Amino acid sequence: MNRCRLETIRAYWSGRVAAYSAVNADELGTIQAKVWDELIAEQLPWKHPLRILDAGCGPGFFSILMARRGHEITGVDYSEAMIECARENVENHSPEASAYFSQMDAQNLTFEDDTFDVVLSRNLTWNLEHPDRAYAEWLRVLRPGGVLLNFDANWHAHLFDPELARLYAEDAQTLRAMGYAVEDEHGDPIMDELIPQLPLSREQRPGWDKACL
């Protein structure tokens, strides 16, 4: 693994803690949080409290939702700043929660095999240098019969596919015509450098993920 690249990714997200946490906090106050909560709950057939790993937990959005349901949460993130933020957010939103947070690389977990009933992740795998290794680790720590739920997207595929670039531009134009502000994706020098180096930037998903699993 390129340790320098991993540290660059950590530094980038550590620098975005306050802004990203604010976005998550706003989302918790909208119908979108209920949609996420019910979507996940539909995939979990068990009624008893579950041991859940929130991989790449960030400021703790999924951890808060699952803690509210009484599950035992373990959140990991490579950014220590994100971990501290997640701890604080869970304490504020769900003070009675059973939640533990640890700074850890989601591609190299230190947990024993078959530790968790559920592995959750959102908007993480596109950041990873070795997403295939992350999937292998998540399956390793997932008990037999457990559930893996990963929510991610083709965030940057349009930068490498002309047809997707055309559709992206059309969508942006439509949104601007409707009065919405569309931010220029470029401009952050760290991401501009990292995106071409990350393997999932050029992959079509979820096709790649299904093949990997």
What is the predicted role of each segment?
Residues 107-118:
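A short acidic, Gly/Pro-enriched loop at the edge of an enzyme's catalytic core
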Residues 200-213:
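Short alpha-helix
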Residues 118-131:
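A short SAM/SAH-binding and catalytic strip from SAM-dependent methyltransferases
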Residues 81, 128-133, 158:
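Short N-terminal helix/helix-N-cap motif within the alpha/beta-hydrolase-1
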Residues 132-144:
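A short glycine-rich, Lys/Arg-flanked "PGG" loop and its adjoining helix->strand segment in the class I
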Residues 53-55, 59-108:
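Class I SAM-dependent methyltransferase SAM/SAH-binding core
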Residues 1-48, 61-65, 147-187:
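Conserved class I S-adenosyl-L-methionine
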